[in-house]
């Protein structure tokens, strides 16, 4: 029943890909197939379902901000992280500099927009970009159970070449004391983090680990305290879908995080993790058909947490 349901939802939502565009500001992302669409569901009871282009690889992009936030909290405690990054929603686009200047004592509004994510990466322990990215990769491999996860070198170089907006955000934060480390090293780790290559299954596994409050459903091993998982899910609800987070909470009601690579990670507490992929994006930078799939799924299975 679940299998046929997700297959029909995928087909039903495929038409929406025509209304979106693949990300073009990072040249490598332009190469994505606009019509691709896939889903993977990892239920906490051990059942797994998938449909469409669920095994297509794509770069994690902003979904990695969840992982960076978890590691930063584990390294520093929540209080220290909150002294550098807020947890308030933003009405501006994900790469905006506006709020850094006019709000919040120069502190980025939240860890899910670029400025906040760069500040978060700067808090991860490690003396070099290599050390930091290795810790992020190690964590991602552990949680997904996929030892082959790695950085896509072409996308990383492409991000680095076109990352001037992110550089300006980072140097501004260095100037205001939010970032204490060497800016170029922090940015290098950030660009690599965004270029980690995953599939729907990988992000569904991260989502189910969060749905299970920090315990790996497959082994029963606790990776992070339940409290940290809860904090991350709360931030996902308020800030995870960029400046469309409010309408997404109303229509879908599932803690989620999107990325401009076309992925959306959605975590239904106590029930399941969902990974969706569709590189055609809406104006806010979210997968246009991916959002529709989650709307339909939430409606049909009554998944809203509200």
UniProtKB/Swiss-Prot annotation:
It catalyses: L-glutamine + H2O = L-glutamate + NH4(+). Substrate binds at residues 62, 114, 159, 166, 190, 242, 260. The keyword Transit peptide does not apply. Its EC number is 3.5.1.2. GO terms for biological process: glutamate biosynthetic process; glutamine catabolic process. Keywords: Hydrolase. GO terms for molecular function: glutaminase activity. InterPro entries: Beta-lactam/transpept-like, Glutaminase. PANTHER family: GLUTAMINASE. Belongs to the glutaminase family. Homotetramer. This is Glutaminase. It comes from Clostridium tetani (strain Massachusetts / E88).
């Amino acid at each position: 029943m679940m299998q046929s349901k997700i297959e029909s939802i995928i087909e039903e939502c495929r038409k929406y890909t025509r209304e979106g565009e693949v990300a073009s500001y990072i040249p490598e992302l332009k190469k994505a197939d606009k019509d691709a669409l896939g889903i993977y569901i990892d239920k906490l009871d051990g059942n797994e379902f998938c449909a469409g282009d669920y095994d297509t690889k794509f770069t994690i992009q902003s979904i990695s901000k969840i992982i960076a936030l978890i590691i930063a909290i584990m390294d520093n405690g929540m209080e220290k992280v909150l002294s550098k990054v807020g947890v308030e929603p933003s009405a501006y686009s994900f790469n905006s500099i506006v709020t850094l200047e006019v709000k919040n004592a120069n502190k980025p509004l939240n860890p899910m927009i670029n400025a906040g994510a760069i500040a978060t990466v700067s808090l991860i322990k490690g003396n070099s970009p290599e050390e930091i990215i290795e810790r992020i990769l190690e964590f991602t491999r552990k949680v997904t159970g996929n030892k082959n996860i790695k950085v896509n070198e072409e996308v990383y170089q492409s991000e680095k070449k076109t990352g001037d907006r992110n550089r300006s955000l980072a140097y501004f934060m260095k100037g205001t004391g939010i970032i204490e480390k060497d800016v170029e090293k922090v940015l290098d780790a950030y660009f690599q983090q965004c270029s980690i290559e995953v599939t729907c299954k990988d992000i569904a596994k991260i989502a189910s680990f969060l749905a299970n409050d920090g315990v790996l459903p497959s082994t029963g091993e606790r990776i992070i305290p339940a409290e940290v998982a809860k904090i991350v899910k709360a931030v996902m609800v308020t800030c995870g879908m960029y400046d469309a987070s409010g309408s997404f909470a109303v229509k879908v009601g599932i803690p989620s995080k999107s990325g401009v690579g076309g992925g959306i990670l959605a975590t239904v507490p106590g029930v399941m993790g969902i990974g969706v992929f569709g590189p055609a994006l809406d104006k806010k930078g979210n997968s246009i058909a991916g959002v529709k799939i989650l709307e339909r799924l939430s409606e049909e299975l009554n998944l809203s947490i509200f």
